Amino acid sequence: MRAVLLVSGGMDSLVATALAHREGLELAAMHVNYGQRTWQKELECFRQICVHYGIVDRLEVDAMFLSAIGGSSLTDATIPVGPADLAGTDIPTSYVPFRNANFLSMAVSWSEVIGANRIYIGAVEEDSSGYPDCRKVFYDAFNQVIEHGTRPETRIEIVTPLIAMSKAEIVRRGMELDAPFHFSWSCYKSEGKACGVCDSCARRLRAFASVGMDDPVEYEVRPNYLQ
């Protein structure tokens, strides 16, 4: 069976890739550049992950229209990336409006062309309070969209293997699978050293600390987010 992996270069997509690789599937990987602040580092990580898992069939997509639309601190330099607020329930400035729907649409198109039956995405329900397109109900609904919007003989399913996991569980699972976390990047702000203070860095650092492991990525600062 053939599967398309949506690989941002982040921790979650890395572990989703490791899980798909363990299944023995024929893998193809897609990476999307949408004008995010750390696009160069994310692309570098995507390529390193593909080499690590022997993924030859790759597609690097330019989706700069999401940057032109704006509305997110990830794509608009005039909107600052705020400090971590792990207890917050509001939609953060880093939310890219309807981003994952755009990514999935491109992945479905490619899957139809290359005959893939599954699309893996490292979405996590734990993030859904801030990112509505990380909810399980969203992916269930999108599977219906695929069924009704593709050729009758097309059979493509979105697979979200991490959807019910916590970030700590994702790190633990990645360790069990010997996933190369040093080839992943989570920081929203920086491409040299991870900032350590944005929401994504905070969630990652807290997850590694929760399982008693050191994150191999280099940080400007490493606050203790377990306190």
Swiss-Prot record:
GO MF term (any one): ATP binding
Binding site for Zn(2+): C187, C195, C198, C201
Single GO biological process annotation from the record: queuosine biosynthetic process
EC number: 6.3.4.20
InterPro entries the UniProt entry points to: QueC, Rossmann-like_a/b/a_fold
Entry-linked Pfam families: QueC
Pathway(s) per entry: Purine metabolism; 7-cyano-7-deazaguanine biosynthesis
Cofactor stoichiometry and binding remark: Binds 1 zinc ion per subunit.
Catalytic reaction annotation: 7-carboxy-7-deazaguanine + NH4(+) + ATP = 7-cyano-7-deazaguanine + ADP + phosphate + H2O + H(+)
Chain positions recorded as ATP binding sites: V7, S8, G9, G10, M11, D12, S13, L14, V15, A16, T17
Names of required cofactors: Zn(2+)
Keywords of this entry: ATP-binding, Ligase, Metal-binding, Nucleotide-binding, Queuosine biosynthesis, Zinc
Cross-referenced NCBIfam families: 7-cyano-7-deazaguanine synthase QueC
Task performed by this protein: Catalyzes the ATP-dependent conversion of 7-carboxy-7-deazaguanine (CDG) to 7-cyano-7-deazaguanine (preQ(0)).
Family: Belongs to the QueC family.
Protein known as: 7-cyano-7-deazaguanine synthase
Taxonomic source organism: Chlorobaculum tepidum (strain ATCC 49652 / DSM 12025 / NBRC 103806 / TLS)
Native organism taxonomy: Bacteria, Pseudomonadati, Chlorobiota, Chlorobiia, Chlorobiales
